[in-house]
From Swiss-Prot:
Keywords: Acetylation, Aminoacyl-tRNA synthetase, ATP-binding, Chloroplast, Ligase, Mitochondrion, Nucleotide-binding, Plastid, Protein biosynthesis, Transit peptide. It is found in: Plastid, Chloroplast; Mitochondrion. The keyword Iron does not apply. It catalyses: tRNA(Trp) + L-tryptophan + ATP = L-tryptophyl-tRNA(Trp) + AMP + diphosphate + H(+). SUPFAM superfamilies: Nucleotidylyl transferase. ATP binds at Q72, H78, L79, G80, N81, G209, E210, D211, V260, K269, M270, S271, K272, S273. This is Tryptophan--tRNA ligase, chloroplastic/mitochondrial. The modification N-acetylserine is found at S53. GO terms for cellular component: chloroplast; mitochondrion. It comes from Arabidopsis thaliana.
Length: 408
């Protein structure tokens, strides 16, 4: 479906700097652990029907911090998405309030097949659930089912300097093929929509990869700018509660599995957009296909196997994959594999992948076979998201001076 990537990684990021980059760099140098627990809370959805602004309670220890993440509806999730993002998201469910979004609006900013978008959306949702996301703990929904995403994006666009968007490397890279003049406005404003996805739900944390920090930097800058332009005393004079309109989201950086590399190039990330399917393991690949891909994957001619050798990126990547899917410690893998040849290790890795992915594939088939069950989950997730987003939108419209509809 065009540019396939996980929204939790917030796409391809560059080293562009904004005015508060120094403070963010210090923040990112000490990333929040995925397993931490917290006592303060994010906003709740109570009272969202009223016309007044909604106050937040940041002191109760009984409400979890909120994490928002998502993925584009490619319909085909690969191992990099799973190990780098989804597997970690599953681990977040017990510690945080979690919202997982199928971001179909993002999928249409580049050419795509209209006949496949809907199916890809449900297939991706089914894969989310098959990977272990528990709807009793987390909300799963489709971005376009919650119109507030686009509403908030427009409000944010009005406060985002063009120069900030021009620095985003994603637009430069994605528009290169068609030429800047032929690229869509949607592609250019893509970062504002991603920021809306985060800020709409007053996210406390956003899962991002080590190499993908530019978007969370932009989201923080936009949140701070809007708070300055419309929050505080200005908002209070319009009848609001004053204070900040948005929380400033913080990055949540996975400590393992955050960067799974291509099977054909150990220096490039595993990606759906890579032209060769041989470069990735898809979660729904058959057993025979997994064996074949691992058998043919790029290796090297060094003796033995080892982690963390800059001259052996493929070796480090394959050992890291094996470590994660086998559930073993790094030291255990080093001891087990240090004297192995590639001919011995590759079947071991293929078997570990098959064993790890087989339950996911079986669960996926069960979910896809029950479309009404999936529809109900996505509808309930959207209801919860709308409830949360309504608080933010009501406050934003009030703070920006809009005349709001009165319901009779």
């Amino acid at each position: 479906m065009g540019h396939a990537t996980s929204l939790s990684h917030f796409l391809i990021l560059s080293s562009s700097r904004f005015s508060r980059l120094g403070s963010l760099t210090r923040l990112l140098s000490k990333p929040t652990s995925l397993s931490g627990s917290f006592s303060s809370i994010s906003v709740t959805g109570q009272g969202f029907r009223c016309c007044c602004s909604v106050a937040t309670d940041d002191t109760s220890p009984s409400v979890k911090k909120r994490v928002v993440s998502g993925v584009q509806p490619t319909g085909s999730v690969h191992l990099g998405n799973y190990l780098g993002a989804i597997k970690n998201w599953v681990a977040l469910q017990d510690t945080y309030e979690t919202l997982f979004i199928i971001v179909d609006h993002h999928a249409i900013t580049l050419p795509y097949d209209t006949r496949q978008l809907g199916k890809a959306t449900t297939d991706t949702a089914a894969l989310y659930l098959a990977c272990g996301i528990d709807v009793s703990k987390a909300s799963v929904f489709v971005q376009s089912h919650v119109p507030a995403h686009v509403e908030l994006m427009w409000l944010l666009c009005s406060s985002t300097p063009i120069g900030w968007l021009q620095k985003m490397i994603q637009f430069k890279e994605k528009s290169r093929k068609e030429g800047v003049e032929n690229a869509s406005v949607g592609l250019f404003t893509y970062p504002d929509l991603m920021t809306a996805d985060i800020l709409l739900y007053q996210s406390d944390f956003v899962p991002v990869g080590e190499d993908q920090k530019q978007h969370i930097e932009l989201a923080r800058e936009i949140a701070q700018r809007v708070n300055h332009l419309y929050g505080g005393k200005k908002w209070k004079k319009l009848g609001g509660r004053g204070g900040s309109l948005f929380k400033i989201p913080e990055p949540l950086i996975p400590q393992a599995g955050a960067r799974v590399m291509s099977l054909t190039d150990g220096l490039s990330k595993m990606s759906k957009s890579a032209p060769s399917d041989q470069s990735r393991i898809n979660l729904l690949d058959s057993k025979d296909l997994i064996v074949d891909k691992i058998k043919r994957c790029k290796t090297d001619s060094f003796a033995g196997l080892e982690f963390d050798n800059a001259e052996r990126p493929e070796c480090n990547n394959l050992l890291s994959i094996y470590q994660i899917v086998s559930g073993k410690k790094k030291e255990e893998v080093m001891e087990e594999c240090k004297d192995m040849s590639w001919g011995t290790f590759k079947p071991l890795l293929a078997d570990a992948l098959i064993e790890h992915l087989s339950p996911i594939q079986a669960r996926y088939q069960e979910i896809i076979a029950e479309p009404e069950y999936l529809d109900k989950i996505l509808s309930e997730g959207a209801d919860r998201a709308e409830e949360l987003g309504a608080v933010t939108m009501r406050n934003m419209y009030q703070a920006m001076g809009y005349y709001q509809r009165r319901r009779y």
